[in-house]
Amino acid sequence: MEPSLFYNHSTKKANQMLGMIWCNLRGCSERLVHAFVSSHLDYCNSLLAGLPISYLSPLQRIQNTAARMITLTRKHDHISPILRSLHWLPVHSRITFKILLLVYKITHNIAPQYLQDLVSLRASSSTRFLRSSSSMQLIHGPRTKTRYGDRAFSSIAPKLWNRLPPHIQNAPSIETFKNLLKTYLFNLQ
């Protein structure tokens, strides 16, 4: 899929919704932005994993504008504290969050079968105790020869998952996992 086609459509729709909200409701509620803008930003965003920041910057600008609308802050105010106060991750971290949430569902058998077929858990064949034995590690697929192949879910998901600390991987519930993961991603920035 040509990246510019996806970006043009996705960015255009999110920008239209943002413009509609901006014209009609100054200081709009966060709920409206989530309903009309965030849904377009999150639509198929796992396809955007591994793209350069230059491709993600239009989506990030839309998110920044939405955050400024909600908080009624000026255009030139620094955006990081605003996003943090709203508990919003930047676009590249949102993409990582969504991918890791899918992997959590895969490792706990609550994802559809077609997703479970894309990644597999590493079997603990050793009888020795290893630090990594308490965590669920995923097997990396064969290395591809293209950048597009390296961005595939089956390639990027194990890389992201295996970098997570074990206490996040072994979260007892999906809500706990989301909270721990969001905190972890906020602290990486």
Placement of each model-derived feature along the sequence:
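Hydrophobic/basic alpha-helical segments
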Residues: M1-Q189
